[in-house]
Amino acid sequence: MRKMITMIVFCLVAFVFPGASRAQLSAPNDAGVSMGHVHLVVQDVEAGKKFWLAVGATPTKLGANEVMKFPGALILLRKGEPAGGTVGSVINHIGFNVPNVTEAMAKWKTAGLKVELGQNPGQCFLFPPDDLTRVEILENKALTVPIAFHHVHFFVPDAAGASSVPEIQSWYVKTFGAKAGKRGPFEAADLPGVNLTFTKSDTPTVPTKGRMLDHIGFEIKDLEAFCKKLEASGTKLDVPFTKRPELGISMAYITDPWGTYIELTEGLNKL
Protein backbone atom coordinates (compact mmCIF):
# COMPACT_ATOMS: atom_id res chain seq x y z
CA MET A 1 0.00 0.00 0.00
CA ARG A 2 2.78 2.43 0.93
CA LYS A 3 4.57 1.67 -2.36
CA MET A 4 1.35 2.30 -4.29
CA ILE A 5 0.78 5.63 -2.54
CA THR A 6 4.36 6.68 -3.29
CA MET A 7 3.91 5.89 -6.99
CA ILE A 8 0.62 7.80 -7.13
CA VAL A 9 2.24 10.87 -5.55
CA PHE A 10 5.15 10.68 -8.01
CA CYS A 11 2.78 10.48 -10.97
CA LEU A 12 0.78 13.47 -9.72
CA VAL A 13 3.97 15.55 -9.33
CA ALA A 14 5.09 14.57 -12.82
CA PHE A 15 1.69 15.58 -14.22
CA VAL A 16 1.42 18.93 -12.42
CA PHE A 17 5.12 19.82 -12.85
CA PRO A 18 6.10 18.14 -16.13
CA GLY A 19 9.67 19.45 -15.98
CA ALA A 20 10.24 17.73 -12.63
CA SER A 21 10.62 14.29 -14.17
CA ARG A 22 12.62 15.43 -17.21
CA ALA A 23 14.97 18.16 -15.98
CA GLN A 24 18.18 16.16 -15.72
CA LEU A 25 21.74 16.25 -16.96
CA SER A 26 22.85 14.19 -19.92
CA ALA A 27 24.88 10.99 -19.61
CA PRO A 28 28.63 11.64 -20.04
CA ASN A 29 30.67 11.09 -23.18
CA ASP A 30 33.58 8.64 -23.44
CA ALA A 31 35.80 11.15 -21.60
CA GLY A 32 33.33 11.22 -18.70
CA VAL A 33 32.10 14.75 -19.47
CA SER A 34 28.65 16.28 -19.88
CA MET A 35 27.16 19.76 -19.56
CA GLY A 36 26.59 20.68 -15.94
CA HIS A 37 25.58 24.23 -15.14
CA VAL A 38 25.75 27.95 -15.82
CA HIS A 39 26.41 30.13 -12.77
CA LEU A 40 24.87 33.61 -12.84
CA VAL A 41 25.57 36.50 -10.46
CA VAL A 42 22.36 38.50 -10.03
CA GLN A 43 21.44 41.58 -8.02
CA ASP A 44 17.95 40.30 -7.20
CA VAL A 45 17.78 36.54 -6.68
CA GLU A 46 14.00 36.43 -6.28
CA ALA A 47 13.47 38.35 -9.52
CA GLY A 48 15.92 36.04 -11.27
CA LYS A 49 14.21 32.99 -9.85
CA LYS A 50 10.80 34.27 -10.98
CA PHE A 51 12.16 34.83 -14.49
CA TRP A 52 13.65 31.36 -14.88
CA LEU A 53 10.57 29.68 -13.44
CA ALA A 54 8.47 31.50 -16.03
CA VAL A 55 10.89 30.34 -18.73
CA GLY A 56 10.20 26.75 -17.68
CA ALA A 57 12.64 25.73 -14.94
CA THR A 58 12.07 23.33 -12.08
CA PRO A 59 13.43 24.84 -8.82
CA THR A 60 15.71 23.27 -6.24
CA LYS A 61 18.65 24.41 -4.08
CA LEU A 62 22.34 23.68 -3.68
CA GLY A 63 23.49 25.14 -0.39
CA ALA A 64 22.71 28.86 -0.53
CA ASN A 65 22.35 28.84 -4.32
CA GLU A 66 18.99 28.77 -6.04
CA VAL A 67 19.07 26.15 -8.77
CA MET A 68 16.89 26.27 -11.86
CA LYS A 69 16.74 22.83 -13.48
CA PHE A 70 16.33 22.35 -17.22
CA PRO A 71 16.83 19.25 -19.35
CA GLY A 72 20.54 19.32 -20.16
CA ALA A 73 21.76 21.93 -17.66
CA LEU A 74 21.25 23.72 -14.37
CA ILE A 75 21.14 27.49 -13.95
CA LEU A 76 22.59 28.53 -10.58
CA LEU A 77 21.78 31.95 -9.14
CA ARG A 78 24.00 33.75 -6.62
CA LYS A 79 23.35 37.22 -5.21
CA GLY A 80 26.06 39.73 -6.02
CA GLU A 81 27.11 42.81 -7.97
CA PRO A 82 28.39 41.65 -11.36
CA ALA A 83 31.22 43.58 -12.99
CA GLY A 84 29.30 43.60 -16.27
CA GLY A 85 27.03 41.67 -18.58
CA THR A 86 27.86 38.92 -21.01
CA VAL A 87 28.41 41.16 -24.04
CA GLY A 88 32.12 41.95 -24.18
CA SER A 89 33.10 38.78 -22.33
CA VAL A 90 34.27 35.48 -23.80
CA ILE A 91 30.76 34.01 -23.44
CA ASN A 92 28.32 36.26 -25.27
CA HIS A 93 25.15 34.33 -24.42
CA ILE A 94 23.54 30.97 -23.78
CA GLY A 95 20.68 29.36 -25.70
CA PHE A 96 17.77 26.96 -25.35
CA ASN A 97 15.57 24.92 -27.68
CA VAL A 98 11.77 24.87 -27.72
CA PRO A 99 9.49 22.88 -30.04
CA ASN A 100 7.53 25.96 -31.15
CA VAL A 101 8.92 29.49 -30.86
CA THR A 102 5.62 31.23 -31.63
CA GLU A 103 3.78 29.37 -28.87
CA ALA A 104 6.65 29.88 -26.42
CA MET A 105 6.76 33.63 -27.10
CA ALA A 106 3.02 33.93 -26.51
CA LYS A 107 3.33 32.10 -23.19
CA TRP A 108 6.28 34.22 -22.05
CA LYS A 109 4.63 37.49 -23.04
CA THR A 110 1.55 36.48 -21.04
CA ALA A 111 3.86 35.85 -18.07
CA GLY A 112 5.25 39.38 -18.43
CA LEU A 113 8.69 38.46 -19.76
CA LYS A 114 10.60 40.69 -22.15
CA VAL A 115 10.93 38.75 -25.39
CA GLU A 116 11.89 39.83 -28.91
CA LEU A 117 11.63 38.02 -32.23
CA GLY A 118 15.00 37.22 -33.82
CA GLN A 119 16.10 37.95 -37.37
CA ASN A 120 16.14 34.28 -38.34
CA PRO A 121 13.12 31.97 -38.63
CA GLY A 122 12.45 30.03 -35.44
CA GLN A 123 14.49 32.39 -33.27
CA CYS A 124 13.71 34.76 -30.43
CA PHE A 125 15.49 36.29 -27.45
CA LEU A 126 14.55 36.52 -23.78
CA PHE A 127 15.91 39.23 -21.49
CA PRO A 128 16.33 38.60 -17.74
CA PRO A 129 15.29 41.31 -15.23
CA ASP A 130 18.78 42.83 -14.88
CA ASP A 131 19.06 43.13 -18.69
CA LEU A 132 22.74 42.10 -18.55
CA THR A 133 22.40 39.33 -21.10
CA ARG A 134 20.03 37.90 -23.64
CA VAL A 135 18.98 34.27 -23.87
CA GLU A 136 18.68 32.90 -27.39
CA ILE A 137 15.74 30.60 -28.11
CA LEU A 138 15.82 28.36 -31.17
CA GLU A 139 13.03 26.19 -32.52
CA ASN A 140 13.55 22.45 -32.69
CA LYS A 141 10.33 20.80 -33.78
CA ALA A 142 11.68 17.35 -32.84
CA LEU A 143 12.08 18.33 -29.17
CA THR A 144 9.95 16.14 -26.89
CA VAL A 145 10.08 18.41 -23.82
CA PRO A 146 8.79 22.01 -23.48
CA ILE A 147 12.31 23.46 -23.28
CA ALA A 148 15.90 22.19 -23.12
CA PHE A 149 19.34 23.72 -22.79
CA HIS A 150 21.08 24.01 -26.15
CA HIS A 151 24.26 26.08 -26.48
CA VAL A 152 26.96 28.29 -25.04
CA HIS A 153 28.15 30.89 -27.55
CA PHE A 154 31.79 31.99 -27.27
CA PHE A 155 33.14 35.14 -28.92
CA VAL A 156 36.94 35.12 -29.34
CA PRO A 157 39.14 37.77 -31.01
CA ASP A 158 41.97 36.94 -33.38
CA ALA A 159 45.40 36.52 -31.82
CA ALA A 160 48.65 37.57 -33.53
CA GLY A 161 46.80 37.97 -36.81
CA ALA A 162 45.42 34.43 -36.77
CA SER A 163 41.89 33.24 -36.07
CA SER A 164 41.35 31.90 -32.56
CA VAL A 165 38.22 29.97 -33.53
CA PRO A 166 39.96 26.75 -34.68
CA GLU A 167 42.23 26.93 -31.63
CA ILE A 168 39.43 27.20 -29.06
CA GLN A 169 37.48 24.48 -30.85
CA SER A 170 40.50 22.17 -30.70
CA TRP A 171 41.08 22.97 -27.02
CA TYR A 172 37.58 21.83 -26.02
CA VAL A 173 37.92 18.73 -28.19
CA LYS A 174 41.25 17.82 -26.58
CA THR A 175 40.38 18.78 -23.00
CA PHE A 176 36.84 17.46 -22.70
CA GLY A 177 36.42 15.01 -25.57
CA ALA A 178 33.97 17.28 -27.41
CA LYS A 179 33.12 16.40 -31.01
CA ALA A 180 34.09 19.09 -33.52
CA GLY A 181 31.46 20.14 -36.04
CA LYS A 182 29.33 23.02 -37.24
CA ARG A 183 26.16 24.70 -36.02
CA GLY A 184 24.80 26.46 -39.04
CA PRO A 185 27.56 28.83 -40.19
CA PHE A 186 29.46 28.56 -36.89
CA GLU A 187 32.32 26.32 -35.88
CA ALA A 188 31.23 24.25 -32.90
CA ALA A 189 31.98 21.34 -30.59
CA ASP A 190 29.37 19.08 -29.03
CA LEU A 191 29.27 17.64 -25.53
CA PRO A 192 26.31 15.72 -24.11
CA GLY A 193 23.72 18.37 -23.22
CA VAL A 194 25.35 21.32 -24.97
CA ASN A 195 26.65 22.71 -28.24
CA LEU A 196 29.71 24.91 -27.76
CA THR A 197 29.55 27.54 -30.51
CA PHE A 198 32.54 29.66 -31.51
CA THR A 199 32.47 33.02 -33.31
CA LYS A 200 35.16 35.56 -34.12
CA SER A 201 34.90 38.77 -32.08
CA ASP A 202 35.95 41.96 -33.84
CA THR A 203 36.86 43.53 -30.48
CA PRO A 204 38.85 42.25 -27.49
CA THR A 205 36.91 40.22 -24.93
CA VAL A 206 37.36 39.94 -21.17
CA PRO A 207 37.29 36.89 -18.86
CA THR A 208 33.97 35.72 -17.47
CA LYS A 209 34.88 35.59 -13.78
CA GLY A 210 33.11 38.32 -11.82
CA ARG A 211 30.64 39.12 -14.58
CA MET A 212 26.94 38.31 -14.72
CA LEU A 213 27.76 34.92 -16.27
CA ASP A 214 30.59 34.09 -13.90
CA HIS A 215 31.33 30.58 -15.11
CA ILE A 216 30.08 27.48 -16.84
CA GLY A 217 30.32 24.02 -15.37
CA PHE A 218 30.87 20.53 -16.70
CA GLU A 219 29.79 17.41 -14.80
CA ILE A 220 32.63 14.89 -14.69
CA LYS A 221 32.60 11.17 -13.98
CA ASP A 222 35.48 10.35 -11.57
CA LEU A 223 36.48 13.99 -11.15
CA GLU A 224 39.55 13.28 -9.03
CA ALA A 225 41.12 11.14 -11.76
CA PHE A 226 40.09 13.70 -14.41
CA CYS A 227 41.86 16.48 -12.48
CA LYS A 228 45.03 14.42 -12.21
CA LYS A 229 44.90 13.87 -15.96
CA LEU A 230 44.49 17.62 -16.55
CA GLU A 231 47.48 18.44 -14.37
CA ALA A 232 49.59 15.78 -16.06
CA SER A 233 48.81 17.41 -19.41
CA GLY A 234 49.96 20.81 -18.12
CA THR A 235 46.56 22.35 -17.34
CA LYS A 236 46.65 24.50 -14.20
CA LEU A 237 43.84 24.04 -11.69
CA ASP A 238 42.70 27.39 -10.28
CA VAL A 239 41.03 25.48 -7.44
CA PRO A 240 42.23 21.90 -6.84
CA PHE A 241 39.98 18.88 -6.50
CA THR A 242 37.90 19.47 -3.39
CA LYS A 243 35.20 17.39 -1.74
CA ARG A 244 32.16 19.31 -0.51
CA PRO A 245 30.25 16.74 1.56
CA GLU A 246 27.84 19.38 2.87
CA LEU A 247 26.70 19.91 -0.73
CA GLY A 248 27.04 16.30 -1.84
CA ILE A 249 29.48 17.20 -4.61
CA SER A 250 33.17 17.40 -5.48
CA MET A 251 34.54 20.30 -7.49
CA ALA A 252 37.55 21.98 -9.08
CA TYR A 253 38.08 25.07 -11.26
CA ILE A 254 40.11 25.82 -14.36
CA THR A 255 40.24 28.73 -16.81
CA ASP A 256 40.48 28.17 -20.54
CA PRO A 257 43.16 30.11 -22.49
CA TRP A 258 40.55 32.72 -23.54
CA GLY A 259 39.34 33.55 -20.04
CA THR A 260 36.33 31.28 -19.56
CA TYR A 261 36.10 30.29 -15.91
CA ILE A 262 35.03 26.63 -15.74
CA GLU A 263 33.84 24.65 -12.73
CA LEU A 264 34.26 20.90 -12.86
CA THR A 265 31.80 19.03 -10.66
CA GLU A 266 30.82 15.53 -9.70
CA GLY A 267 27.45 15.04 -8.05
CA LEU A 268 25.26 17.75 -9.57
CA ASN A 269 23.58 15.04 -11.64
CA LYS A 270 21.92 13.87 -8.43
CA LEU A 271 19.92 17.09 -8.03
At which residue positions do the language-model features occur?
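Bacterial N-terminal signal peptides
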Residues: 6-18
